[in-house]
Amino acid sequence: MHNSLIRKELEAGRSIIYFTQGVSMRPLLYDKNHPKATQIYLEPLTHHQLAIGDIPIFQKQSNGQLVLHRLIASDDDYYYTRGDNCVSGEKVPREYVFGYVTKIYRNGKWLSTDSKIYQAYVLVWLHSFWVRKPLMLLRQQLSKLKRKMIGK
């Protein structure tokens, strides 16, 4: 489904099911080309107040790309998000957010983001960032070193 169609459907108040793309939300969400490909159920943002830990969908100001990243903070004008597999986050104007994930399809079943198991995962994930961050930075440096050593 094309980016403009996803946004159009959600802004029209319709929910959609979509395969995720990219690696920024691993290990929760896997790319459509990965053996563990993940589908998500997106709902319009119409009457939902986003909470810390939710996964909104927004459009990047710089290139129009659609992004799913976890909400880590907010204020009156902005949402602050970060991918689960990312070190840094982004500041997103509220008007750029138009939907959010309510269900995740993996291993042959749907998992609601309201379920106790998912909420426990979010709690652990959010509070473990300061432990995971140095490990992610180390992994990035090792990947750069490996690419340099093999000449890519």
Residue ranges and their predicted role:
Residues M1-K152:
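Extended hydrophobic leader/signal-anchor segments used for secretion and membrane insertion
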